[in-house]
Each structure stands twice: as C-alpha cells, then as structure tokens.
C-alpha cells in the first residue's frame, strides 16, 4: 500500500513539473510572437531602403570587438535604456540585435520598446555575429 501511495505521489509531482514547464514554454513563445524575427538579408535590404532603424543592444566590449551595424542606435543598456534613446516616431520600423542567437538582450530591449508604444518592432536573432558572418559591412567603434 505504501508503495502504491509513493508511486502515486511521484507521478503527481512529475505531472506538476511538466505542467509548469509547459507554462514557461508558452510564456516564452508569447514573447516571440509579439516580436517577429527577421533575417540578416531582410535587415540589410530594409536598412538600405531606410525602412527600418537598427538598434544595437550589445555592451561596449562586443561593440568594440565586432563593430555595429552602420547607423545603428546604440542603447546605453538593453534592460534600463530610456525610450528617449529611440526615434521619436513610434511608427518607425525598429530592428533590435545583440551578439548572436545565444544573446537575449535584443529580445528584452525589443519587448521594452513595444511596452513604450513602438508598433513596428523586430529582432534579428543572428545578431552582429550573423551580420559579420554574412559579409555585411560594419561600423567600428
């Protein structure tokens, strides 16, 4: 009887853990749905046509090491930047990027821009590393 009770409790605990994991996954996918992702080539084309403004969410060390997209707005900090650092026109297309696909700073900053009322916000998940790998021009700092 104790064995059955123990197995039942372990099963319930495992079920509870799987549900909380599923909620976490749903929450993170909601962020991804709010902030569309774009490719390096899409960004290159849109920047050339002046359709979007690039926004760099990297720290100074990454900027000095890898450079920045030409003409990018350089945020003071991806988590604590002021909306006044972004273009005044909240309908202007903004594309946020950070170091690479393992960096979450661009998503954090893009979410903050959405909260501040910007309507056309995107993220380039490949970041500056993907930009450089694709042979695109960078501005050195």
Where would I find each of the regions flagged by the language model?
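Structural scaffold elements adjacent to functional motifs in cytosolic proteins
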Residues: 54-56
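A short acidic-Thr-Gly-centered motif at the start of a beta-strand
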Residues: 41-50
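Rhodanese-like catalytic fold shared by cysteine-dependent sulfurtransferases
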Residues: 2, 6, 15-40, 61-96, ...
């Amino acid at each position: 009887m104790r064995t059955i009770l123990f197995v039942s409790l372990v099963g319930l605990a495992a079920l509870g853990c799987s549900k909380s994991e599923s909620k976490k996954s749903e929450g993170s996918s909601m962020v991804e749905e709010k902030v569309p992702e774009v490719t390096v080539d899409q960004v290159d084309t849109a920047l050339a046509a002046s359709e979007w403004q690039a926004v760099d969410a990297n720290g100074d060390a990454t900027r000095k090491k890898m450079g920045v997209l030409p003409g990018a707005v350089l945020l003071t900090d991806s988590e604590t930047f002021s909306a006044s650092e972004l273009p005044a026109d909240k309908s202007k297309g903004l594309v946020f990027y950070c170091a690479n696909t393992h960096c979450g700073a661009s998503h954090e900053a893009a979410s903050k821009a959405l909260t501040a009322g910007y309507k056309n916000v995107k993220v380039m998940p490949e970041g500056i590393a993907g930009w450089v790998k694709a042979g695109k021009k960078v501005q050195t700092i």
